[in-house]
Structure formats: structure tokens, C-alpha cells
Amino acid sequence: MIALDTIQYYGQIPGVNHYNGKKEFMENAVKIAQLSDAYGIVGSLSFFNHSVLDPWAVSSVIMRHTERHVPLIALQPYMYPPYTAAKLIQSFTYLYDRRIDLNMITGAVTGELQQTGGYIDHSSRYKKLHEYVQVLRLLLESDSAVSFKGDYYELNNLEFKPLLPDKRLFPRIFMSGSSEEGLETGLKAADFVVTHPGPLEHFKRHFSEKVQGSAVQSAIRIEIIARESAEQAWKIAHARYPGNRQGKIQLRMKTNSESSWQRMLAELALASETYDEVFWMGGYMNGGIYSPVLVGDYEQVAAYLNEYYKLGVKAVLLGSMYSEEDFIHFSRVKEGISNPV
């Protein structure tokens, strides 16, 4: 596992369905990655679902147009067997001399799993994911033939060349730790366990205390809206994610979701829209996004982030950082953080 002295920030690349056409999508994907490089963001999460382009293909274009940007690629086991994923990692690191990080997912949308004939129950999906990561690590780390026999994957004396040229190019593996099975698997197999955090006390009780003492790092996925004044920030937040009836209906449905993080966020949103004057569930309540938002002036948001860092958070996956203005405002927040990149 890895040890970090500084906080690692990742942005995200929106799906192609957010844009009017190929040209607009690619121009914006590259622009976001280049802004990430310019403003000290490690890399960007590229999503996987049935409505977006393949994240490996998108990342290959982005890497050609950036110098340091590290893709954080959502990896769904039914899409790529571990051998294929390992070969892609090997090829990307060889061609670009750059790391590829992985966000291991099991799938929060039951319908997509059923469509591919890959549906298995929640607990079994994490058992399969654990095996997947074991095989992936064996392939990337072993300098001799690899054999493995599990319930889902089998390798027989497999030769896998060439080796990654430098240990610094080994992928950092992120995994959701919102459910009990996810957290248990992440603590055994990942470098980072990720959650959509609750407000500080909730996060401490339900997540950070369970991770403390392990070699695995904590990561959170959150959006930030910060401005010179809290009044400005809240005005922007409400304009970006206005209340609507459909969102409220969907919110109650999410309390019955198979996804534990969807249920948790829905329950928090139903209990209160705002916590600690900064932690806002309005974007999730209204169906606009799938994460909480920190809203306030630069000092308020920086202070709240610092409290997460005191609870052991070492990586932040930032939502909706799509323009240079977004990066500038986040840079102002970072100025008030006690352990900046």
C-alpha cells in the first residue's frame, strides 16, 4: 500500500451525453485535463456506464494532449477481464511513461448488470472484484509466470511481459467503501477506499473510524462551490441545482436502492438539506448530482475540508470542475488548506 504526505485531488471528465457532439466533447475533455495540469490536480475520473464512451479510449486522447495528467479510469469487471486491463495499463505506461489509476466499480445500476447477463448479488460482486484485483496485481507485479485459481478467474502459468519499467507507474487502486462488503473488500485489495461522505460527525462514525489503523487511505467524492462570500456561493449553488418535484420523488425512491451510498445520501437529504452551515445535500435532493456539495466562502470550505483531512482523508474526487473559473475558485480554497498539494 502507499503512503502519502499530501492530499491528492482528482477532477472528472463529463460523459459524452453532456455535450452536443464529438467536437465539443473532445475539446472540453482535453481542456479540463489541461486545466487540471495547470492548477495542480493529479488527474481526472473517467466514468463507465452504458451511455458514455469507453474511458480507456477517452483517456488515450487526453494523455496525448497533456504532460502530467493521470487518468482515473472506472473499471467494471464485466467490461474488461483482468488480463485485458493489465495489458492496457502496461501499454499506456509504456507509451506515455505515465501512471494509470483505477476506480474499481461493481455497478450501482442493476439494469445494466442484467442487460449484460452479468448480474450477481451485491455480496458476490465484491468477492469477484477482490479476485479481479488480486489477478491484476499478480500480472503487473510478478516477474515470473503467474498462476491463479479462484471462484471467478483462473490463470495457468501465464507469461506477462514486458514488466512495468518503474514501480512509480503502478496504478493506484480506488474502491468504493460505502457498504460493509465494499469497505471490507477495499481494506484488503485497494490503495484508497472511497465514499460519498456524510457531514463530519457522520463521516467519522460511519467511515473514518473503520479505516483508521489500516494501510489503506481514505478518499471522498464531493463537489465544491466556494466564492468570496458565503452569500455569493449559496446563490450559485441554488441556481446550479434548483429544486424540482421530480427530484424529490426520485429521492424517496433512492432510499430503497440496492446501492448503499445512494440509500445513505437519500436518508441524509431527507433528514436535512444542510449540515454544519457548509455541507449541502440540495444538489443530490434535486437529482442534479450524486454527491454532497460544500458551499461557502473560501475560508469556510477550506476549514471544513481540513476537518476531513484530520480524519484521515488523503484523496478528494472533485465534481463539476469544468471551467477555468471553477479551478481558480478551488485554488483559492486550497490556499486555506493546511496540507495542500
Swiss-Prot record:
Gene Ontology MF terms in the entry: alkanesulfonate monooxygenase activity; oxidoreductase activity, acting on paired donors, with incorporation or reduction of molecular oxygen, reduced flavin or flavoprotein as one donor, and incorporation of one atom of oxygen
Catalytic EC class: oxidoreductase
Keywords recorded for this protein, A-Z: Antibiotic biosynthesis, Flavoprotein, FMN, Monooxygenase, Oxidoreductase
The organism's place on the tree of life at top rank: Bacteria
Keyword Oxidoreductase: yes
SUPFAM superfamilies (alphabetical): Bacterial luciferase-like (SSF51679)
Pathway, per record: Antibiotic biosynthesis; butirosin biosynthesis
Reactions performed catalytically: 4-(gamma-L-glutamylamino)butanoyl-[BtrI ACP] + FMNH2 + O2 = 4-(gamma-L-glutamylamino)-(2S)-2-hydroxybutanoyl-[BtrI ACP] + FMN + H2O + H(+)
GO BP, one annotated term: alkanesulfonate catabolic process
EC number of this enzyme: 1.14.14.13
Record-linked Gene3D superfamilies: Luciferase-like domain
UniProt similarity note: Belongs to the bacterial luciferase oxidoreductase family.
Protein function: Monooxygenase component of a two-component system involved in the biosynthesis of the side chain of the aminoglycoside antibiotics in the biosynthetic pathway of butirosin. Together with BtrV, mediates hydroxylation of gamma-L-Glu-GABA-S-BtrI. Not able to hydroxylate free substrates, activation by the acyl-carrier protein is mandatory. Octanoyl-S-[BtrI acyl-carrier protein] is also accepted as substrate.
PANTHER family listed in its UniProt record: ALKANESULFONATE MONOOXYGENASE (PTHR42847), ALKANESULFONATE MONOOXYGENASE-RELATED (PTHR42847:SF4)
Name this protein carries in UniProt: 4-(gamma-L-glutamylamino)butanoyl-[BtrI acyl-carrier protein] monooxygenase BtrO
Lineage, highest ranks first: Bacteria, Bacillati, Bacillota, Bacilli, Bacillales
